[in-house]
Amino acid sequence: MELSVSSPKQSVLSPPDCMSDPEEEHEISEEEDDDRNHKHRRKEETRSQSLEQDSSDQAFSRPYRKNYRHYENGNSFSEHEKRSFGTGSGQRVQFDNQRMRSNPMFSRDSGPGRGRGNYGSWAQRDSRFNPVDLSSHMVQVGSMGQGMFGGRGLAGVSAAQSAPWPPFGMIPGVPNGGLDGFHHLQGSLRPPLNAPLNMGIPRQRCRDFEERGFCLRGDMCPMEHGMNRIVVDDVQSLSQFNLPVSVPGAPHLAASSKQVPAQFGGASFMNPKGAHGRTNEGGMAVDGLGYGDAYPSAGGTDFYDPDQPLWNNSTGETSGAISTLNSHGVDENVAPLDDSNQDAAENGCGIRDSRSTSQSVWGRMKGSNSQANSKEKADAVLNSSAVPEDQLKEVSVNSSRHGKQNHVGESVAKVVDSSNISNDMMNNTRKPTQKAMRTLFVNYVPHESNRRDLILAHFQKFGKVIDIHIPVNSERAFVQFSKREEAESALRAPDAVMGNRFIKLWWANRDSIPDNGLSTGSGASMKGRSMTASGAQNQFPIAAASKSNHVSSIAKVPTFQTGGAPSSSEQPKPVVVTTSGPKVTPLQQKKADTLERLKETLRKKQEMLEQKRNEYRKKLATLEKQGTVVKREEADEPDAKRVKLDTASDSGAAIASPKTESSTDKKVPILKPLSTAKLSTETPSPDSKNFKQRPYSFTTSLNAPMVNRYKLDNRTTTIKVVPPLPTGLADVAVVKEHFSSYGEVSKVELEDNASIDSGKDHETQNESRAACVTFVKRSAAEKAFANAKCWQEHTLQLVWVTRQSNRESNNNNNNSNSLSVSRDNLSSKNKCASVSNDPKPAVEVKTSSTEEPENTNVSGDNDSTLDKQETKESDNDNNKSNHESIEGASEVIATAGTDEEQSEQIHQ
């Protein structure tokens, strides 16, 4: 509904309490001449919530809002009019000389009346209202709240400085049709900032804001956007504006039930900001809506559908209503390899000339259109190919000169500090190219699900699948359909791909099997990057094929040529479509040769690894076989045979020295770990299977030595000092002190006459005594046996004592022999012979030899060498004890004979 002004003259709008006589107008005009009066300037600041009027004539020649901007020369221009910087396109006001003296940022109230029965009290008008004939009989100004005409903009809902104005019935008696369209904008409006900020600093007008109606740089833009503007913090709130997309500068409010008239337009139609006011809130900032000179008809305008989501969940694309905004043609449906490159492409490819003034914040989001528009899109692409290249360069430089960009999904606006960086990024941006016609790119597929049969089972529901390419060891796949419609249906399917909602679908960059010989790739290479200009997704089949060793990938060399017409989700792009037959460019041929060389190298490496793997397996099997053979031989050897060999051993070898015995004991466990070390120090195989097998072979090879180390040692640790003991050694403390230097002594015993009478001769007592020293460890006993034979220049005779029973039997034999010798001197030699032929040592040898295998069997020892040596040691100990007992018996016999002779001499 168009609202017009009833009369160019002023009407009474002031509240009743502000009414004054017309004579006061001349007095007020005199006060206005003195604009440097401090009192009036203070009055101007305290009335920041009031509205401003330029003049009574201008109040009806333009919309009811502060629509004129001023320069230093005092000229004013209308925001509807396109102008060049430094010129004013508006009318000269009657108080032009006063405006030149006043601050251009804060033009004070002009015209007679200044709140005294005239329009002066409503001089500063809000941007949301239009020229309406507001007469005193229909508007009660005194009843209007401060929230309706508050300051330099309407109070926002989020940070309101006054009560919010209602959507309907704001002005009694005024139709609300013209205000229906923006009653829902209260949530996105912002309160004004303090007016004196940035006072007196004139800035240039933002060209984007003037020509296109909005500025994507938002609060980060250093240019001037006027006193009123709307800053949008998030993308979702843009749906409230319903930005037009097809017609340049066509600002419509789709929520309004009636068409907005042309004179309603203006770059700051709904802007609540104060002069140079800025909010520091990050995010996508739109300084104004795309409102141009006048509103064209909305017949061909595609509006945003609030019932349709901004993004399709299945494809990651925008809805069809928003997708037509994307006119720069940057390829964003495929995940880029370089985010910075993508950012530069998004910023740089936004063409800022008259052809792209309809591009808004939605311009960088790719959408999927209906199938009905696919032919129109294809024709538009072919027609746009005639755009001169130098014009594209000019537009790119113009866009990169600003050096700022904003992302839709981000909460903070990105600022590029240097224009050189932006220019460099623009040089590296990829050129727009067409998409594949029938091939879909499947990404984020789990490795276990990335199989040909599973992918085919899902996509064959939508149509005939003619090719599936799965790169090796990747989460990607390329599925090509026989028809374009089938691929689109699979792309727009609402259900999850293969039952996994994380799997995403995009259009691929090219078709593996070209269609009608059309090439969709430009084939141009970029400097500084080893990728084609067709986009980041071009590298996916190339990089994946370099890892593949399948023969089928050789047939996919035509992947480098793409075919087909532009997809329905593509926007018109200035590209050159080559309709000639498929060509193999030198770059593509070079890549194919490189791919073949890589595959050949990979095949040779795999053959070498397989050969090494087989060799390691053979070695491992041989070593395991050798270990099992040795164990079987040890287990099959009978115990009786070992006893027989031990008993038949030579007595000379049995009386081996303790040094050699100890050395052999120490050498045996050393040899075994050396043999096992050979198994454990093998060169590790690169195969993961061999790494798993190595710990097993290592533990099995060290199994026997580990058990032997903890084997129970039953060898004796008792040493006997054969009598006669030297004088002074027949004391337990002395014996212990002498032998404790070689190791820890657990027990010292003096045999025979341990408790003697003081009346007997000490020398005779020492001759009949023997000392038994028991050590804690066998090693200490061996050391003492080898080195403790000398005590104060006396030589000691040391023997091993195997058992307590053996010592007792020897003592009994010695006592019986001494008694028999005392009775008959002549039969002493026979007694000695009988002692030497005593069968007990032989029995003891057998028992010891049989006991040792039992002990080894209990401990689980399978080492025959250790068993043999232990058996020999026990035999040597027994033989030594036998010889010692024989020698002791002969000495006892000799001493008994001498004692008997002495007693006979005494009797005589």
Swiss-Prot record:
Identify the domain of life: Eukaryota
- Give the span(s) annotated as Disordered: 1-124, 333-375, 558-590, 629-695, 807-908
InterPro entries to which the protein is assigned, alphabetical: Nucleotide-bd_a/b_plait_sf, RBD_domain_sf, RBM26/27, RRM_dom, Znf_CCCH
Query: PROSITE patterns, alphabetically?
Result: RRM, ZF_C3H1
Q: What UniProt keywords are attached to this protein's entry?
A: Coiled coil, DNA-binding, Metal-binding, Phosphoprotein, RNA-binding, Zinc, Zinc-finger
Q: Which Pfam families match?
A: RRM_1
Q: Which residues form a coiled coil?
A: 587-630
Q: Where is the RRM domain?
A: 438-510
Compositional bias segments (type: Basic and acidic residues):
630-647, 865-886
List every position bearing Phosphoserine: S657
Compositionally biased intervals (Low complexity): 807-828
Q: Which residues lie in Polar residues bias regions?
A: 1-13, 48-59, 90-105, 356-373, 559-588, 677-688, 846-863
Per its record, how is this protein called by name?
Zinc finger CCCH domain-containing protein 41
